[in-house]
Amino acid sequence: FFPNAPVRNEEMEDYIGLVNPKSSIAKRLVLEKNGIRSRYYALDKSGRVTHTNVEMAALAVRHLLAEAAMTPAEIDLLACGTASPEQLMPSHGVMVHGALGGDGGAEVVSFAGSCCTGMHALKYAWLSMRAGDAQRAVCVASERLSAWMQARYFEREAELIDQLMEKPILAFEK
């Protein structure tokens, strides 16, 4: 599941804004080197969040279950991974399980904290099936970083850098 329409490189700042109101100095170089041409934001152009991370994960699972002609109650194991949960507790996996209706006695596990959380979830699901602990495991990895990358969160830092450029002695003050 991808939220909204793809956002091209040229449109990024229409969604996340400008800092101090300047375009990013590193943007062109980073995008040129990483080869990414578009991405999906869970934001509209006004910066309003359109989907939570939990909603995106639950929608992805619902699409999978629809293709498999299954219901959430038929899942034995739900393994979720994210580096960008909306909250620490309850865990991301428990929140996704709840968004799916929380039916059945599915085991729910959450992996969080780094870029490899999706692989951890996949490995856990695979090993659980190999061990016979689960017959129908679903693994989902989701991220929603777009809301954290909005310009408004970087304005204060930009102001401090401007002050430092005007008065370099500030770097040595305690």
Residues of each region from the PLM?
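Short glycine/serine/threonine-biased micro-segments
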Residues: 33, 79, 139
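Short glycine-rich or small-residue beta-strand-to-loop segments that form or flank ligand, phosphate
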Residues: 76-84
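Acyl-thioester C-C bond-transforming condensing/cleaving domain
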Residues: 21, 62, 66-72, 86-174
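Conserved "HGTGT" condensation-loop signature of ketosynthase/thiolase-family condensing enzymes
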Residues: 1-76, 98-104, 168-173
